[in-house]
Amino acid sequence: MKKQFRAGAAAGLLAAVSLFSAVLLTGCSEEKKPVVSAETAEAVTESASEAGVWPGDENRIVLKLASTLSPEMRALNALSGFAEEVFRETSGRIDIQIYDSSSLGDQVDYLNGIRQGTVEMCLVSTAALEAIDPHFVIFGMPGLFTSAEKVNRFYESDICRELLDEFRQKSGIRSLALFHDGIRNVWLKEARVYRAEDFAGLRLRIPTGVRIREKEFQALKAEVVPLPLSDCSAALQSGYIDGLENNVETIVNSDMIGQIDYQVKTEHAYSTLLLLINEQILMQISENDRNILTDCARKYSGIAFQQYMEGQEAAYRAAEQAGIETIELEEKEKRRIRESLLSATKEMLEDIFPEGFYEKVDAL
């Protein structure tokens, strides 16, 4: 299990952190790796000492942040900066520990954990949130979000704010910030797809607990296989799946990259992530530190967005350099696929939203 977490540099502080973390993370005995820079740790240690705030004091709060992403992913890099700045600006009173690479399970585990309070924070896809609130299906509707800018407009809109507020009241989970995962395409080992009919019979991995993806590819007569992301490499290698749908950055920063032969540019959906926190735990933090936490979340969401926009071309280039051939679908085939996916999933909206909701979001 790989863990990254915040800690002070001074020996006395580090010992206290280790003891405190051991109590919180019962059963997690692997070596811990501090990721706070030495300069930050020294400055925070001095500041905390002057303020009388020490690790282990009741004023010190440790927040576990779980993610399926690997450390190379831009969103996770931004979260590391977020955690460090929160640690520094609160003089060590808030210590955010990042558990990457599915080390605490998959997204379903995180959502269960954050409601139970065993995981305080997580970064999960909006598609995964559909399992506990069907309203999040809107984020993944085929062809609805065709650009990062449109996604941002929706997230900042009154429509989305109302959705997130209702979600917070019902679930006890607050969204702190939006992160971009990007356009989703289909990635295949050996098999090729040029037409909608070519999906028939293909075993395609979809994320666990995401009904919209299931409906989409069942509409194309593919055999959908729900799997955690961490199981995909072995599933490809064994032939258990023929491929998966995902964004380019996830593929090139995983060990799947050496097993995939083709990228089919379906561009069927746009993938987004939300940084979530347990509302009850957030409200236990002092108002000043709570403001620091929420402001830093928004700041590093913006940083991650700029990095995402700058890094997309490099990610696609990395896929090409790895020997992955891109299959550009003819526009009429791409349109047929999207229409098929939309037809299969739009009925989900009718059971959840008032008439005209899709069109209202589409017009943003």
Task: Describe every region a protein language model picked out.
Residues 1-47:
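Gram-positive cell-envelope targeting signals
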Residues 28-149, 159, 168-169, 174-364:
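N-terminal secretory/targeting leader peptides
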Residues 163-164:
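Short, compositionally biased "basic patch" segments
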